[in-house]
Amino acid sequence: MRCPCDKGDNQWRLRIPRIAGVIEKYGFDIFGVQEAVKHVADVLQAELPHYRRIGCGRAPMCDGESNYIFYDGNRFECIDYGTFWLSGTPLVSGSRYEGAGCPRTCTWGRFRDLRTGKTFTYYNTHLDHVSSRARLDGAKVLAANGLRASLDRGETVFLTGDMNETLAPRKEDSPESLKKYAPDELKALAEKNPIAFFSTLLNDTYAVSETPHAGTHETYTGYRDPPRVRIDYVYATGNVKVLSHVTVNDRIDGKFPSDHDPVAATVEIR
């Protein structure tokens, strides 16, 4: 969603109708956002009244930017939810790793599909933009404080986020990057790179989609075309059939909804 710090055509009050328009156009059932502060998220939710949201801010009093999960209340029931911090003390609000640019969080929710009765757990995060060490440590905290337990219980799991990282060096990253690594190589790289780390636990929906990826490979725009780098991801467990994967490059009257283009996957839980 981008923090409310931009001016001109990119100020948040002008962007909210664009964001809502993209959401309504594509009819997302559930989605995660980053950098959303409460008063901005409240305005977005007012434009999308059938959506509900979970999550809290990253600051010590749980205010500030949040990784909210929005979901269609007519489609899903939220069974349980929470937020933890990507730090050495994940239950201490506002905590962070040394070297991190700011506190980082993960919001999670356990949901029941009201149509099928199937349940799943959804994690949504935003890794640090300054420190590569903090990004990797944050990914490991996310796994240790929920993701691995969900996998051990055999739950269907989704993970979304702005990871501020690529698998290959940024100038070399491409749709083929994941295919370059044998399992042992990926496992070794997982000790250095959060994208490799998550890819040893879950499927990158981009890589396993039954239909070719649509839209640009890159997802971050900084309000400029073409998008520059792929740092936004949707992961899922192996029991999830991925029908399609797309980077939504919509512009509304030539204007950007946000500084990242959203990434969407159409899936079926088997």
Set out the residue ranges of the language-model regions.
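Stable alpha-helical elements in mature extracytoplasmic
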Residues: 15, 19, 40, 44, ...
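Alpha-helical scaffold elements lining the catalytic groove of polysaccharide deacetylases
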Residues: 10, 133-147, 224
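Structured beta-strand-rich core segments of catalytic domains in phosphoester-bond hydrolases
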Residues: 30-123, 127
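Catalytic metal-binding/acid-base residues of hydrolase active sites
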Residues: 37, 126-128, 163-166, 209-211
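Active-site metal-binding loops of divalent metal-dependent hydrolases
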Residues: 1, 125-127, 162-163, 261
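Metal-dependent phosphoester-hydrolase catalytic domains
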Residues: 133, 148-158, 165-270
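N-terminal, active-site-proximal structural segment of metallo-dependent hydrolase catalytic domains
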Residues: 1-47, 58-65, 269-270
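Acidic/histidine-rich helix-loop elements
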Residues: 1-17, 86-101, 131, 180-183
